[in-house]
Amino acid sequence: MVIKAQSPAGFAEEYIIESIWNGRFPPGSILPAERELSELIGVTRTTLREVLQRLARDGWLTIQHGKPTKVNNFWETSGLNILETLARLDHDRVPELIDNLLAVRTNIAAIFIRTAFKHNPGNSLEVLAEKEHVEDNSESFSMLDYDIFRGLAFASGNPIYGLIINGLKGLYTRIGRYYFSNPEARKLALNFYQQLVILCRDQSYDNVMECVRNYGKESGVIWHSMQSTMPSDLSEVYR
């Protein structure tokens, strides 16, 4: 187990999470007593207590007063905030994780972009106008892409869509920094944003879903062509 954390709390958090992931503390099991665990990890009980509370908030653990701390099945109890952690823990499954993330983005974006254009076209066009100021580099495009999807999600009038995109931000933007290092990816994205502008201005709401899904397929082709040269630890790219 290689742990890169600098602080005692960070070390303890990574130790426990990696132990859950690797089966040392499997889902459904009970964590060792606080004193034993603090000695095992090499941190104070106060530090350990703070870490356990944070992990419980993130869905890794269940803490009940007077009862032992239980390890959860994190797939069922955690939220989007653990995506970056999962990418760091299992490099071999990163491509699958990213494919699933992009599929979710495409499926929900097809819905919220149509709604945004229909109910809030002015705000939608303002969001899309950000493309006029983007610099031709991966960092700038990564943030632009995130900001456009996030902005249109909130423009839909349903803030839940925006919160979902917020939850994807960390891993999403790191993926973007690698993906948008490809000039073809940047060109495809600009073309997609322009298509959205036209659909919004023409009130062609029924064509939005097809446009978004086509972009998902075309960007997926580029993404898959880049996987063979993808860094082994994408979650750390340009951190």
From Swiss-Prot:
SMART domains: HTH_GNTR (SM00345). Keywords: Activator, Cytoplasm, DNA-binding, Fatty acid metabolism, Lipid metabolism, Repressor, Transcription, Transcription regulation. GO terms for biological process: fatty acid metabolic process; regulation of fatty acid metabolic process. The gene is fadR. It is found in: Cytoplasm. PANTHER family: FATTY ACID METABOLISM REGULATOR PROTEIN, TRANSCRIPTIONAL REGULATOR, GNTR FAMILY. Homodimer. This is Fatty acid metabolism regulator protein. InterPro entries: FA-response_TF_FadR, FadR_C, TF_FadR/GntR_C, Tscrpt_reg_HTH_GntR, WH-like_DNA-bd_sf, WH_DNA-bd_sf.
